[in-house]
Design a protein with these regions (language model features):
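Flexible "arm" and connector segments at domain edges
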Residues: 1-76, 80-146
């Protein structure tokens, strides 16, 4: 993210959180912002993000006119707002959460093993296990001990 608008020592994520806190406080909406309600609203907004892509052949950027791009930008802002508010309500540091999750993803999806392969982890892992079983069966048939 672009850091030049955030005050010294504060991230833009912190600025967004504070802006959202103020918006909610001014409207006395915090009583409605339970983690469950925020997660539900996040899901709704994420679904609304799909609407401008409906019925497009591929959904590539070249198919999106300015009106659709504005709608997408606004829905992305809604998704981000609810994500930041949900994280705030649960005391989740989104930066740290992303670092933690990326470490897990790197272990789960090693680049040399999955490059160019869009299958889910369980699918390629199952294929690897099947290949291992087939190799073991071949070795057994050839008289090798496992």
């Amino acid at each position: 993210m672009d850091q030049h608008n955030a005050p010294e020592g504060r991230s833009e994520l912190t600025e967004m959180r504070d802006m959202l806190r103020e918006f909610v406080r001014e409207r006395d909406w915090s009583r409605f912002h339970s983690p469950k309600n925020l997660a539900s609203a996040l899901s709704v907004e994420a679904s609304e993000l799909l609407e401008p892509f409906t019925w497009l052949a591929s959904g590539d950027k070249s198919e999106l006119d300015e009106t659709k791009l504005v709608a997408i930008r606004h829905e992305m802002a809604d998704v981000l707002a609810y994500l930041v508010m949900l994280a705030d309500s649960l005391d989740v540091d989104l930066h740290r959460a992303l670092i933690e999750k990326m470490a897990l993803n790197r272990a789960k999806y090693p680049a040399d093993m999955v490059r160019g392969d869009a299958r889910k982890y369980s699918e390629y892992k199952a294929a690897d296990n099947k290949a291992d079983k087939n190799k073991a069966d071949e070795n057994k048939a050839a008289g090798y001990k496992a």
